[in-house]
From Swiss-Prot:
Residues 165-255 form the 5'-3' exonuclease domain. This is Flap endonuclease Xni. Mg(2+) binds at D109. Belongs to the Xni family. Keywords: DNA-binding, Endonuclease, Hydrolase, Magnesium, Metal-binding, Nuclease, Potassium. The lineage of its organism: Bacteria, Pseudomonadati, Pseudomonadota, Gammaproteobacteria, Vibrionales. The keyword Hydrolase applies. It comes from Vibrio cholerae serotype O1 (strain ATCC 39315 / El Tor Inaba N16961).
Amino acid sequence: MSLHLVIIDALNLIRRVHSAQPDPNDITRTAETTTRTLQRIINEAQPSHMIAVFDHHLSDRGWRAELLPTYKANRKPMPDVLQQGIDAIQDAWWQLGIDSLLSEGDEADDLVATLACKVAAHQEKVTIISTDKGYCQLLSPTLQIRDYFQQRWLDEPFIAQEFGVTPAQLTDYWGLTGVSSSQIPGVAGIGPKAAKEILNQFSSIEEAYASPELPAKYRKKLDPHIEMARICKQVSALKTDIELGFNLQDIRFNSSSAD
């Protein structure tokens, strides 16, 4: 069997399932629903290796908030009842044969990105299960992102249609436009249309900033805010060099556990 690593963005999945439950206090039902969801994902993906990555609920906003104090400053905390039920959900997933990785100081996104890129760099297949478009900056011939809830692939054609740039330009795009859901401001006065025009003409923020060909209407917006653009790009970029402390053999998926 060829290697296929499936990485679950755990809280991304759990929060969406939990928010759709008729009784938010019924964590048993949330656990059962997420387990059925994972069973369907397993049946579709046929993974050889699988892991669920969790943000540690006590972790702060990390290095990104040090660079950009507004980063996720207004994000709603996890509901207490759900936070208290995470262990039960992890236990249910363990019964399926899926181990959990909890972040300790790093955001789950960076752990997912590091693991995915390490495996994809060896030309092995990786699927990230998440609705988070931030992972699309990682896209490669062997690394794909699946939005399970919309039943769609967040692939290059999707990125081209959604943003009008390439996956490699996404962090530059967000450096210009910002990301409202994470309180990343971007450059004042540069929205999606302007960012697309700039990045269709230039490969990056730095190339645009250095070029005498940058149109004056964008120059007057970018020049006073170039440092903010750089910070927003850096905050939008996922880290791929975290020490993980385990190897692939540790997360080999035993399909008999999911039967």
